[in-house]
């Protein structure tokens, strides 16, 4: 896209693009209303209330876009001059409400403008995050922060309702193709304010969208499966999490290393719970060496190594939101160690003392007999070990057939 040399040039370029209203030009125009495009950094673009001036440039081709552009300039003014992200965020909501009322609702037989709408929604999320940071030090910071995200979600949801109610079925004109992008926008907002329960009807709508799914952009499908996989992971639905995250990873472009890395941060723990350990080479390739000792500890049944790895990389795992899940790998690690003990003992009746000896050998000295019995009972209850505890004889009696079934074939809880 050519650089913007002046405010007159800015309006002129938009007007020329509006002469041909197709998806390609919609993508080009979207950059002109982005708060992160190069033009947004130019001082001559930071104009307060430009739309109220009597002498000004205009998008004469389209009055609605003229108003949107003027509001966009006001957003830029509040970001760069007034440094008022709260007003910038509320103005961005005005833009989206205007877009919904005058474009999504009234322009029935076209959808070329959806790339512009996607950009406006993405910027609204970022402005909401910025507004949140502005009030985070206030006494009522948390509630105010949530209100920014909630107002953003409300504006996007209103547009979502408009698009899903579109009766046109053809790919070239239906606004229903915006469903997935808007679902992704709302996924990110609800993750931010911890209201994932509000996503259920949106997920159900995608599940039931039929052949329309093939018309969605692959980039939106990748993002959706990434978010769906994360939600499924936190819901302890490991099979759905694995399926979704694998789809996202395999369909993410090979040169998008940072995005593939983000997907792996959640896919790796899911795979580990299902008994599939990542290779050291994979972890190194995607700069995820924080997992190296975690994986080694789980594979070797070494509780001390696992605990040490979690402690050493606690800040990273907490930032990613997976620390508590990784802590639950202790049960898998206990299982690995107990499987090794059973192989050494070589009988179906294993004294509990043998497990305690093994625990002490790997540096775990704070597990008494009662806690050991509780750990084994939980492993049996979750079907990770086939057998039963004989409290009277202080032994674990394991099944002679497949006493330690594959983790992918048992309950994930």
Swiss-Prot record:
SMART domains registered for this protein in UniProt: PAM
Domain PCI stretches: 222-403
Annotated signal sequence range: none
Stored InterPro entries: Csn12-like (IPR045114), PCI_dom (IPR000717), WH-like_DNA-bd_sf (IPR036388)
GO CC list: transcription export complex 2
Example of a GO biological process term: poly(A)+ mRNA export from nucleus
GO molecular function, one term: double-stranded DNA binding
Segments forming a coiled coil: none
One matching Pfam family: PCI
Family membership: Belongs to the CSN12 family.
Protein name per Swiss-Prot or TrEMBL: PCI domain-containing protein 2 homolog
Organism: Caenorhabditis elegans
């Amino acid at each position: 896209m050519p650089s913007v040399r002046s405010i007159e040039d800015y309006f002129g370029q938009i007007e020329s693009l509006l002469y041909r209203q197709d998806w390609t030009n919609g993508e080009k125009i979207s950059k002109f209303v982005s708060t992160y495009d190069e033009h947004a950094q130019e001082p001559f673009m930071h104009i307060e209330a430009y739309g109220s001036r009597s002498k000004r440039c205009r998008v004469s081709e389209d009055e609605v876009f003229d108003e949107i552009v003027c509001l966009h300039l006001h957003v830029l003014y509040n970001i760069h001059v007034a440094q008022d992200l709260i007003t910038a965020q509320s103005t961005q909501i005005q833009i989206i409400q205007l877009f919904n009322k005058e474009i999504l609702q009234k322009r029935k037989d076209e959808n070329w403008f959806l790339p512009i709408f996607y950009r406006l929604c993405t910027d609204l999320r970022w402005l909401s995050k910025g507004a949140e940071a502005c009030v985070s030090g206030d006494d009522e910071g948390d509630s105010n922060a949530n209100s920014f995200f909630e107002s953003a979600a409300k504006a996007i949801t209103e547009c979502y309702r408009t698009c899903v109610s579109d009766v046109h079925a053809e790919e070239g004109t239906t606004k229903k193709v915006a469903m997935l992008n808007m679902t992704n926008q709302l996924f990110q907002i609800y993750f931010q304010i911890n209201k994932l329960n509000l996503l259920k009807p949106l997920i159900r709508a995608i599940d039931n969208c039929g052949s329309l799914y093939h018309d969605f952009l692959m980039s939106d499908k990748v993002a959706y499966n990434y978010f769906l996989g994360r939600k499924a992971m936190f819901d302890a639905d490991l099979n759905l999490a694995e399926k979704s995250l694998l789809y996202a990873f395999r369909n993410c472009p090979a040169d998008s290393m940072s995005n593939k890395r983000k997907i792996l941060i959640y896919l790796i723990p899911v795979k580990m719970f299902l008994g599939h350990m990542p290779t050291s080479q994979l972890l190194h390739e995607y700069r995820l060496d924080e997992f190296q000792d975690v994986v080694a500890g789980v594979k070797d049944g070494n509780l001390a190594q696992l605990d040490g790895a979690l402690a050493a990389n606690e800040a990273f795992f907490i930032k990613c939101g997976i620390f508590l899940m990784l802590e639950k790998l202790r049960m898998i690690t206990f299982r690995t160690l107990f499987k090794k003990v059973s192989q050494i003992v070589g009988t179906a009746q294993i004294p509990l003392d043998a497990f305690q000896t093994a625990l002490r050998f790997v540096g775990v000295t704070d597990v008494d007999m009662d806690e050991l019995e509780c750990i084994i009972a939980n492993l049996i209850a979750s079907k990770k070990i086939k057998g039963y505890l004989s409290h009277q004889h202080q032994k674990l009696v394991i099944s002679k057939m497949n006493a330690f079934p594959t983790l992918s074939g048992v309950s994930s809880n």
